[in-house]
A protein has these predicted regions:
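"Short basic amphipathic alpha-helical interaction patches in structured regions
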Residues: 86-90, 136-144, 184
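A structural "domain/chain start" motif
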Residues: 29-95, 219-282
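Sec-exported extracytoplasmic/periplasmic mature domains
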Residues: 98, 102-110, 131, 215-223
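Surface-exposed short loop/turn segments
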Residues: 107-108, 114-174, 249-282
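Bacterial N-terminal signal peptides that target proteins for export
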Residues: 2-18
Length: 282
């Protein structure tokens, strides 16, 4: 009798975990690739991506790997429903992309200021944001706080109103021609994307994933979705925790929220509660 009473909670937790895993595999927002008008060329791009990400890309390895310096032009937005988002919240998303790009590119390139010449000039454009349903996000956040502690397993979000992000970006050389380009989209996942009570909550959370994928393509000079994963560098870990960036040019995008941001994310708070945004304007 004692044996049964000890094992039931464990079996219940294992059962819940299995259900969560099965749900997470099929329950994520579907965000199609949105081709905008910001790239110099959309030719010769090949389909790529991972289990959660859709992508089309092209990269010219020789000039990309030969490049030593890079300049980041602030991310812009060309979305049809821009009026549905507070400009301050939209700015947090675009700046989070810039911050992630700057941190990722710092692994191999010297990132220079906006008024300096560079071997590569990088510019990204948000082409679509699927808004997060704030009511559903709030319900998920409250439910997660209570049940995850009791069951000691991750609790999935409510599969309603999941948001998403679509971005396009390119790297242009000194001769003005495109050396690399990417179309990218990803939707929030029930299990891996924490609910934030904001219409841009999921887009903000996914922005760092785009920045990591695009910067990895330039650092490696190849498809970032192929090959082995890269171990985060010391400078990248430091920056993610809110520390100073490797290059002064990255200070323009402000510091990452770090541990405070992680706690805010667990509580479902909007991005603006912990992210102060860009440090300067350009």
């Amino acid at each position: 009798m004692t044996f049964i009473s000890l094992r039931l909670p464990e079996m219940r937790s294992q059962g819940v975990f299995c259900v969560v895993l099965l749900l997470s595999l099929s329950s994520c927002a579907s965000v199609p690739l949105h081709q905008g008008t910001s790239l110099g060329s959309y030719a010769d791009m090949t389909a790529s991506g991972g289990s959660l990400t859709k992508a089309k890309l092209r990269v010219d390895p020789a000039p990309v790997l030969a490049a030593q310096t890079v300049r980041i032009v602030r991310t812009s937005a060309q979305i049809g429903n821009s009026g549905a988002f507070d400009p301050k919240n939209l700015a947090l998303v675009t700046n989070a992309i810039d911050r992630a790009l700057c941190t990722g590119l710092s692994d191999r390139f010297q990132v220079v200021a906006s008024n300096q010449p560079a071997d590569l000039v990088v510019h990204a454009t948000v082409t679509d944001i699927v808004p997060t349903n704030r009511t559903a996000a709030a319900t998920s956040a409250v439910a997660s706080l209570g049940t995850s502690v009791a069951l000691a397993v991750p609790i999935p979000r409510i599969p309603i109103g999941l948001g998403g992000l679509s971005v396009e970006a390119e790297a242009v050389g000194l001769d003005g021609t495109q050396k690399a380009a990417m179309l990218w989209s990803r939707g929030a996942n029930m299990l891996t994307t924490k609910a934030r009570i904001s219409t841009v909550g999921d887009a903000y959370s996914l922005s760092s994933a785009f920045g990591a994928d695009f910067s990895r393509m330039l650092v490696k000079g190849q498809d970032p979705f192929k090959g082995t994963s890269m171990i985060p560098s010391a400078q990248k870990i430091k920056a993610s925790l809110g520390g100073g960036p490797k290059y002064d040019a990255c200070k323009a995008f402000g510091s990452a929220p770090g541990i405070t941001g992680a706690v805010a994310g667990q509580l479902g708070l909007p991005p603006g509660w912990s992210d102060k945004g860009a440090a300067t304007t350009q």
